[in-house]
Swiss-Prot record:
Organism of origin: Shewanella sp. (strain ANA-3)
InterPro entries assigned to the protein according to its UniProt record, in alphabetical order: GTP_cyclohydro_II (IPR032677), RibA (IPR000926), RibA-like_sf (IPR036144)
Annotated keywords: GTP-binding, Hydrolase, Metal-binding, Nucleotide-binding, Riboflavin biosynthesis, Zinc
Protein's recorded name: GTP cyclohydrolase-2
Function: Catalyzes the conversion of GTP to 2,5-diamino-6-ribosylamino-4(3H)-pyrimidinone 5'-phosphate (DARP), formate and pyrophosphate.
Record's catalysed reaction(s): GTP + 4 H2O = 2,5-diamino-6-hydroxy-4-(5-phosphoribosylamino)-pyrimidine + formate + 2 phosphate + 3 H(+)
Gene name of this polypeptide: ribA
GO BP annotations listed: riboflavin biosynthetic process
Length: 203
């Protein structure tokens, strides 16, 4: 994998003005983005998140997942902290792509869970890779992280490239009647670390 830094621009948001850094994978032509806020330290832990693209949740306000809620909460937390980063990776549908994700949703509408749907389409439960994060973090100057995630694979990916994960910060937001079963499957079958709050009926 060959990641090339392209350019940086300002990104005004409801939570403040972030910097948006563009990257291109010259082997796959996929484009990734790093958002940064404030002054990042290479010596002190920086609050951050690795976020995989989710068009339905991030842009179309879908309640089938917690992705959009997690992205907005991460940006808000970073702004309130005064500094931080988000690596926005173009890995739609845990790596299977948008159209296959819609096919998976169709199977879920018929009773399959999120893992079963991927497998019925011939895909692993999670196809995402994280080798692109090393050059992205080098570009923005981050070496120590307070990582906002429920996914142990992301913590492992950070450690494997030599980034110290000082703290895992849980990001449990967005539970609703449309995604409760999905969240439970992420915990029981994909190993995501979530509290019982996500598996009890809303009052």
């Amino acid at each position: 994998m060959s990641i090339k830094y392209v350019a940086t621009s300002k990104l005004p948001t409801p939570w403040g003005v972030f910097a948006m850094h563009g990257f291109e994978d010259t082997e796959t032509s996929k484009e990734h983005v790093a958002l940064t806020f404030g002054t990042l330290s290479s010596d002190a832990p920086v609050l951050g998140r690795i976020h995989s693209e989710c068009l339905t949740g991030d842009a179309l306000f879908s309640l089938r997942c917690d992705c959009g809620f997690q992205l907005q909460t991460a940006m808000q937390n970073i702004a309130e902290t005064g500094s931080g980063f988000i690596l926005y990776l173009r890995q739609e549908g845990r790596g299977i792509g948008l159209l296959n994700k819609i096919r998976a949703y169709e199977l879920q509408d018929k009773g399959a869970n999120t893992v079963e749907a991927n497998e019925q389409l011939g895909f692993p439960a999670d196809m995402r890779k994280y080798d692109m994060i090393q050059p992205m973090l080098e570009q923005i100057g981050v070496k120590h992280v307070r990582l906002m995630t429920n996914n142990p694979r992301k913590v492992k990916a950070m450690k494997e490239i030599g980034i110290e994960v000082v703290e895992r910060v849980p990001l449990q937001v967005g539970k609703n009647r449309y995604n409760e079963a999905y969240l439970k499957t992420k915990s029981t079958e994909l190993g995501h670390m979530m509290s019982e709050y996500h598996f009890t009926d809303e009052e």
